[in-house]
Amino acid sequence: MFGLSKVLRVGEGRAVKRLHKIADQVIALEEKFANLTDEELKAKTAEFKERIAGGEGLDEIFLEAFATAREASWRVLGQKHYRVQIMGGAALHFGNVAEMRTGEGKTLTCVLPAYLNALEGKGVHVVTVNDYLAKRDAEMVGRVHRYLGLEVGVILSDMRPDERRKAYTADITYGTNNELGFDYLRDNMARSLSDLVQRGHNYAIVDEVDSILIDEARTPLIISGPVDGTSQFYNVFAQIVPRMTKDVHYEVDERKKTVGVKEEGVEYVEDQLGIDNLYAPEHSQLVSYLNNAIKAQELFTRDKDYIVRNGEVMIVDGFTGRVLAGRRYNEGMHQAIEAKERVEIKNENQTLATVTLQNYFRLYTKLAGMTGTAETEAAELNQIYKLDVIAIPTNRPNQREDLTDLVYKTQEAKFAAVVDDIAERTEKGQPVLVGTVSVERSEYLSQLLTKRGIKHNVLNAKHHEQEAQIVAQAGLPGAVTVATNMAGRGTDIVLGGNPEILLDIKLRERGLDPFEDEESYQEAWDAELPAMKQRCEERGDKVREAGGLYVLGTERHESRRIDNQLRGRSARQGDPGSTRFYLSMRDDLMVRFVGPTMENMMNRLNVPDDVPIESKTVTNSIKGAQAQVENQNFEMRKNVLKYDEVMNEQRKVIYSERREILESADISRYIQNMIEETVSAYVDGATANGYVEDWDLDKLWNALEALYDPSINWTDLVEGSEYGKPGELSAEDLRTALVNDAHAEYAKLEEAVSAIGGEAQIRNIERMVLMPVIDTKWREHLYEMDYLKEGIGLRAMAQRDPLVEYQKEGGDMFNGMKDGIKEETVRQLFLLRKQFIKQDAEVAD
């Protein structure tokens, strides 16, 4: 009726107009649904499900379902969707990215499309950036869905498989991208149907979609298993490298994140190890240990790229400042850092299963996302995920003032000015949010603020447990919050304090829980929310008089989008607010891209350290550098996707066949085909030369005897009356005779096992043999594909396209793996046949 599926294919301007019309129609239903009793409103869910069962599509119940969820939100949460939130919800339902400014209520927006799509009973996944937000949204926003009779589940990192399975059977499931992706991988390693937890990939709404689908897309999800033994050379090189000198023994390219060992370095290492030639074949692994030790020393910084917690090296997400729990660098890099930090070196890991987030999210039948800043990555979202980005208008005009960047010569001068600015702002009651690029910088600034006696909260990878409480109070008068990258934090900073979160904290402190005792929680919520809102509003008025939230960035990020996300925390919902970045010539981005030119100019002009400059040249240089880095990162992600596409097609084939085997009660046809194809391959290999005289029959017979005990007489087969003289025996005759013989021998195994445990027993044995073989061969294939990819770049030196070569050789390896699965499965099953024969012989004796 609206041409709904085409809403965003008509140009953004016309799309927004259509979304406005949809919002008008939903709002027009407001009075009708407000007049319904609680029972009548709740009954709408059953009515919609009946209509869907009767053949109506989601688009036909769309307006009424949105109106139902909107009214339920008002009754349960005391919040009614604004026009722009209805528009955002519609954009999400159509499978697009809704770009909504910070503070416009993305979490509430999500209620509408989640409810509508859950009515089909196929499951809706709402994807957040961390466990806390998944749990918070499932509890808080999930109250609306539970009120309407839907089940809401949440996936958390510490959950058992049975808890996960129950959560996935819910109508709406909240979880992080990592947990959903790892569950997908674990499901495809399961040995029985009872071990599966997910039930398919129908519709996903990804919150902070740019953070998840772009920032984290370069890092694949990997389930690993330890490789026996840890090399002593990690510690050896962790001691050697600190004694080496940068630019003398080795060189570092910080922009490309690469290192190179110079001749002097090679000689130094050879001397330290007491060897003659570091590059001799027997020492080939040592070069890898050396390079990783140099990278650990020069390119990986503690409290920026990783933290050490409880004797464990934990990776920090460079974009969000969060700890990536369970992630480890591969190819020995993590072990090199562990050696550098002198903590326990854990075994190297072998990949058991892997998928990139790019390919995981492309599994969904329908995908949608929300973010505050997506326009800079709109092309990438469309090109890779086929997602269109539509900018949803703000509910009120934006009043934010973005002040000019201030550039200082040194870091020390910059941070001194930052502290002065913070002190001045807090004195007049203005809250300040300070963005830093690393844990190290946030703690350094915290020390400076403490010395000045300025009270503040720190929000970084080390304190994420207190994140909600800190952010909920970041809008209080005079509050100072130091944050490591506010990207993906997921909680609004409300002037005067966030009443909903502050009340939730208060109720939980009293022992009330929205999951455990929803009725008591809701009763207290309804009674106390008005007073909490009034208290926060009164404090908010004071903050508005002081100028609103002031956002202060202490360094430019390499991505403009991350800078924009930080700025976007200010001036939400039409509030006043301002932002400013403080920079120094020693900042990472300035050192890498702006170079010494500007610093030399400042020195020539005798600019004092504590005097900043405001320069369009610097600002333009930064913008150019950011655009350059963004393009590099985009190319890297595209390249990752191109290579992973090869693995993805192979993964889909192997996982599909594996699932089919898992779900089949009888896999005997698979086994029969494997026997036929394996024996046929042996015959084809031996009879490749057309003439009988040239056949390698000895090789064929040896291979068959290694596979099973042929009952056919070889001499009779070749010279017997059935086929006449050797010259008259065709390869097809040979194949037919041997395949029939193998089938006959396998039938004896089936008969022997069935006599003991019935036919079901042999079918179970077939599955018990086949599944581990598939997993082992797939694991070996992943290792070989990794090895192939590492060296494939060298093909360019021979004027060959590395990607084409990777596709060709990877395809050949995959076919070889599939043949290996068949051969090994048949061999192991025939081993059982031999064991039965042996047992029968022992009984006879």
UniProtKB/Swiss-Prot annotation:
A Pfam family annotated for this UniProt entry: SecA_DEAD
Catalytically driven reaction(s): ATP + H2O + cellular proteinSide 1 = ADP + phosphate + cellular proteinSide 2
Topological relation to the membrane, as annotated: Peripheral membrane protein
Keywords: ATP-binding, Cell membrane, Cytoplasm, Membrane, Nucleotide-binding, Protein transport, Translocase, Translocation, Transport
Subcellular location: Cell membrane; Cytoplasm
EC class: translocase
Residues bound to ATP: Q85, G103, E104, G105, K106, T107, D492
Gene3D superfamilies: Helical scaffold and wing domains of SecA, P-loop containing nucleotide triphosphate hydrolases, SecA, preprotein cross-linking domain
GO CC annotation: cell envelope Sec protein transport complex; cytosol; plasma membrane
GO MF term (any one): ATP binding
GO biological process: intracellular protein transmembrane transport; protein import; protein targeting; protein transport by the Sec complex
Entry function: Part of the Sec protein translocase complex. Interacts with the SecYEG preprotein conducting channel. Has a central role in coupling the hydrolysis of ATP to the transfer of proteins into and across the cell membrane, serving as an ATP-driven molecular motor driving the stepwise translocation of polypeptide chains across the membrane.
Entry similarity comment: Belongs to the SecA family.
Self-association and partners: Monomer and homodimer. Part of the essential Sec protein translocation apparatus which comprises SecA, SecYEG and auxiliary proteins SecDF. Other proteins may also be involved.
Name this polypeptide is given: Protein translocase subunit SecA 1
Annotated gene: secA1
